[in-house]
């Protein structure tokens, strides 16, 4: 398929720069994947679209404040470090700016000196492998010294960094938030439980590759980035039980969807406790094995994310719905409004 088939006109003013004051005050577009019919609502009414016995699957990853600003120990030159992937213990793959200042053996000091990074290997495109040395607990030091790596299309500074975390975030490791989950409040989750909806959790640590544009003219040639995922025994058992009893499985976000489809594809449609790295690329023509519907935000033109959504609801239905969203001035991307596909 040609990349241009997933393009649409998006005015820049519709890219949400800040989150709404109330998480569930965002608008909700409901898209019928069979007919393409669209209805408009608010996210606080999401419970109306669920039935007893359905299961909502959430990604409980937590975003690292992964952007660090430090200086070279020998010269005092300023250096910016972005954590990409934990390799082993205190060893990380990072992105450094300006990369030319950091050679193998360079020591970078952050804050008051309780965190240091030693460059152990030079990679291409500004990549560097480093080993951290610190006093105390690494993630606590990072929380006090690091900044949130907001998506490139968000230009505003975030006043409250918790607004770039879901209310159920738990497992630290993402470079970006699973943004479909940002709309949920604890009260909304409680209301779903009271209605008899099961709530299950998976973990997928979102990498910065999620913002990487698809550049191949034919989308089949695009290579997805790999991301770490995990599903425990409790979630696997819950999902298999829901499926057996005829309930629907609704994933929250493309990250939850990719995790569920990775696991179900590997086990003949069943769910099993597992962990590993997934680079699954879902686009039209894909047969879904895990989910019946999903909640997601409004995505970038020509992105792998709009291709996944198109695989579930049909490209023509999705583009028609997106054009209506533009006309109705929905807010787009990470801090934007939501879509329920069912």
Swiss-Prot record:
It is found in: Cytoplasm. Pathway: tRNA modification; tRNA-queuosine biosynthesis. The keyword Cytoplasm applies. This is S-adenosylmethionine:tRNA ribosyltransferase-isomerase. Pfam families: Queuosine_synth (PF02547). It catalyses: 7-aminomethyl-7-carbaguanosine(34) in tRNA + S-adenosyl-L-methionine = epoxyqueuosine(34) in tRNA + adenine + L-methionine + 2 H(+). Transfers and isomerizes the ribose moiety from AdoMet to the 7-aminomethyl group of 7-deazaguanine (preQ1-tRNA) to give epoxyqueuosine (oQ-tRNA). PANTHER family: S-ADENOSYLMETHIONINE:TRNA RIBOSYLTRANSFERASE-ISOMERASE. GO terms for cellular component: cytoplasm. The gene is queA. It is an enzyme of class 2 (transferase). Belongs to the QueA family. HAMAP family: QueA (MF_00113). Its EC number is 2.4.99.17. It comes from Bacillus pumilus (strain SAFR-032). Its main location: cytoplasm. InterPro entries: QueA, QueA_dom1, QueA_dom2, QueA_sf. Monomer. GO terms for molecular function: S-adenosylmethionine:tRNA ribosyltransferase-isomerase activity. One of its GO terms (biological process) is tRNA wobble guanine modification. Keywords: Cytoplasm, Queuosine biosynthesis, S-adenosyl-L-methionine, Transferase. It comes from the Bacteria.
